[in-house]
């Protein structure tokens, strides 16, 4: 049994514009050097651009669908058994799914060249909404790795 106490999860408040906890988490993950107002502006404008590009009335629904399309269901974790290290496929918890999806979308937008961050993030949202783009590719690669190592599922812990 672990001697460590359970980590207390920090409560994330809902964002001011859409009253959504998921968008608030996304804003926090986008933030650099504690500059939340800049991060909020970028995220809100890119959500507006997303709704504009796909002609969606409900902006939050469009954002959530883009995020859901990138969430991974399984991932591989290293497990050492008798001197050999195996990549064991493991199901991903819901909180981690959300965190990975956000991380992948943001990193894909940051890697894109040219344009402003708002446009790059909006394009990545559109790509995620349409199940294409770098973030979706990352999800597919993760699933492919898990599928390739399916033989080692009995090493799960």
UniProtKB/Swiss-Prot annotation:
One of its GO terms (cellular component) is small ribosomal subunit. One of its GO terms (biological process) is translation. Keywords: Ribonucleoprotein, Ribosomal protein, RNA-binding, rRNA-binding, tRNA-binding. InterPro entries: Ribosomal_uS7, Ribosomal_uS7_bac/org-type, Ribosomal_uS7_CS, Ribosomal_uS7_dom, Ribosomal_uS7_dom_sf. The keyword Cell inner membrane does not apply. This is Small ribosomal subunit protein uS7. It holds the Pfam family Ribosomal_S7. Part of the 30S ribosomal subunit. Contacts proteins S9 and S11. Belongs to the universal ribosomal protein uS7 family. It comes from the Bacteria. It comes from Borrelia hermsii (strain HS1 / DAH). One of its GO terms (molecular function) is structural constituent of ribosome. One of the primary rRNA binding proteins, it binds directly to 16S rRNA where it nucleates assembly of the head domain of the 30S subunit. Is located at the subunit interface close to the decoding center, probably blocks exit of the E-site tRNA. The gene is rpsG.
